[in-house]
Curated annotation (Swiss-Prot):
O-methyltransferase that catalyzes the 2 O-methylation steps in the ubiquinone biosynthetic pathway. Gene3D superfamilies: Vaccinia Virus protein VP39. The lineage of its organism: Bacteria, Pseudomonadati, Pseudomonadota, Alphaproteobacteria, Hyphomicrobiales. This is Ubiquinone biosynthesis O-methyltransferase. Belongs to the methyltransferase superfamily. UbiG/COQ3 family. The keyword Transport does not apply. The gene is ubiG. It comes from Methylobacterium nodulans (strain LMG 21967 / CNCM I-2342 / ORS 2060). It holds the Pfam family Methyltransf_23. GO terms for molecular function: 2-polyprenyl-6-hydroxyphenol methylase activity; 3-demethylubiquinol 3-O-methyltransferase activity; polyprenyldihydroxybenzoate methyltransferase activity. S-adenosyl-L-methionine binds at residues 41, 72, 93, 136. GO terms for biological process: methylation.
Amino acid sequence: MSETTGPSIDRDEVARFERIAATWWDEAGPMRVLHRFNPVRITYIRDTVCRHFGRDPRRPLPLEALSLIDIGCGGGILSEPLARLGATVTGLDPAPTNIRVAQAHAAEAGVPVDYRGQTIEAVVEAGERFDVVLAMEVVEHVVDMPAFVRTACAAVKPGGLFFAATLNRTMRSFALAIVGAEYVLGWLPRGTHDWEKFVTPAELTGAVESAGLTVIDTTGVVYNPLGGRWAMSRDTGVNYMIAAERPVA
């Protein structure tokens, strides 16, 4: 198995994101939805990590000395802010163009992130483990979700955390995330998502717990079109995030 291929990699999905790689940091471009979503993701990860590890989220570097890996990091729009919070961040992406964009932006910004054109399978096989493992907006793009989650969870150190964000497989998510976002509003390039690959909270929880972790939180995320902002919610019918922990022993 090469470092950029594996059972989790859908080459069509990789090619689709490579075609728009140059736009990762364009807040008005194809990734604008993720840019708007980013503050919610960062807050959720920071606050959950701080509660778990007994940190103060108000500190300038609340994630200092914690190792974190961002699977499917794309151009680094999540990796960089988490590195700015003090985490030692590794960003993985199987698309070489994405990695080049991420590396160039991090170098220009002066933010230390270890970007690699690797799969999580290669990292786990090499024996690397992390305090925090992220699979944000990734599980709906892989070939075999349970196998991918099992491998991603294997990268979590004892006492560490796993996070995932994805889309629920409901008629509402089809109407909003595909018909609305891709075809009516044009927020995302057409073909970005395949509704049949969306994952229900029960399916994701089952995969995570089969990998030996315990889900400690499930939170919905909703979009307010009037304010143009995303916010956490009890509503998991479309977008949601989970956090899970690996027992210390």
